[in-house]
Amino acid sequence: MSSVVVVGTQWGDEGKGKITDFLSQNAEVVARYQGGNNAGHTIKFDDVTYKLHLIPSGIFFEDKICVLGNGMVIDPKAFVEEVAYLHERNVSTDNLRISNRAHVILPYHLKLDILQEEDKGANKIGTTKKGIGPAYMDKAARVGIRVADLMDKDAFREKLVQNLKEKNRLFEKVYEADPIQVEEILDEYYAYGQKMAPYVTDTSVVLNDAIDEGKRVLFEGAQGVMLDIDQGTYPFVTSSNPIAGGVTIGSGVGPTKINHVVGVSKAYTTRVGDGPFPTELHDEIGNQIREVGREYGTTTGRARRVGWFDSVVVRHARRVSGITDLSLNSIDVLTGIETLKICVAYRYKGEIMKEFPASLKVLAECEPVYEEMPGWQEDITGAKSLDDLPENARHYLERVSQLTEIPLSIFSVGPDRSQTNVVRSVYRP
């Protein structure tokens, strides 16, 4: 038995999709356990680039089972469109399974997301406006509609009528917006549900059976630890738990069945949306990293904020997610920068802080304490092992591993699957 979780150690966009795709080659089941189509992952192989938002990266392997777990919120329309996108590119979806316990995103969630974000004005959190937060709100309030409900038109209608009473009061009285009628949703979304139906099952059974049979199961997190609703930079976070602990809740697999946790990080730091970012760069080096690394959001197209590698953040991620293996991406993007910096601690009111603070007010006043390292000029995009890297690049990787206290298992020197290299197997017993 070998089950592995892949989590982002920063604010998302670390390259989890690429690493999951790479690790999928040796897995038999690939599962997502939280989030929805607010996630965006880009996978490139054979010079073809694919962009997915909902479906796990393992879909490109016909012999892998791909699971959308119960902890997800699924937009039926977005799902049907993504399946069509894959079919147009001759990618089969026969190996896909959807949890009958996952919640669904409906048009009123999308509308509410936009209205709530606009209403916050200067205090907006930078939501992707995909309805994720409002869908999780309904789940917590116990009024959510699940995939199982979508399969039954009468049950779907009954819950829809009840929910729209409340939502329309909100739209009309609070936001002075037009109400939504049952007829605007019912038939269209029931039809989407019928297209989803062949994939729907009890995925907890699928996953536990696979693990019990000794199969390799890979769990794919969306977003990152710093966007976790409990452990991230609250309230500038997502509405679910991307940390490894979210696997047990969002997939129906017990904690005793998880073997290793791979923390994915860039060799620098990026962030989309608002919120504190201690190592953010506003200079020419920041622009260079953004352009060379093509740091624009897969889901939103927004330019990502860019900064130096922050070991305080990744150490925090290691602790709260129990990370056992480090996967460091986009090392090649730093090529050509004369002096590199790594944040080793924060300075707050003259005191050194080595752990990530809970208070955003404190964080906003923290100054990064940097350690400088010499960069490298050599092209490293063809490197196949640590020995192929220039000495300064190798030292940089070693220092990141030391500071984060996570052994390096994978590093990548470019966007293609062939540019990802294994230092030690994450599927070890």
Swiss-Prot record:
Binding site for Mg(2+): 13, 40
Positions bound to substrate: 298-304
InterPro entries for this protein: Adenylosuccin_syn_GTP-bd (IPR018220), Adenylosuccin_syn_Lys_AS (IPR033128), Adenylosuccinate_synth_dom1 (IPR042109), Adenylosuccinate_synth_dom2 (IPR042110), Adenylosuccinate_synth_dom3 (IPR042111), Adenylosuccinate_synthetase (IPR001114), P-loop_NTPase (IPR027417)
Enzyme Commission number: 6.3.4.4
GO BP annotations, alphabetical order: 'de novo' AMP biosynthetic process; IMP metabolic process
Catalyzed chemical reaction(s): IMP + L-aspartate + GTP = N(6)-(1,2-dicarboxyethyl)-AMP + GDP + phosphate + 2 H(+)
HAMAP family, alphabetized: Adenylosucc_synth (MF_00011)
Family the entry assigns: Belongs to the adenylosuccinate synthetase family.
Protein name (database record): Adenylosuccinate synthetase
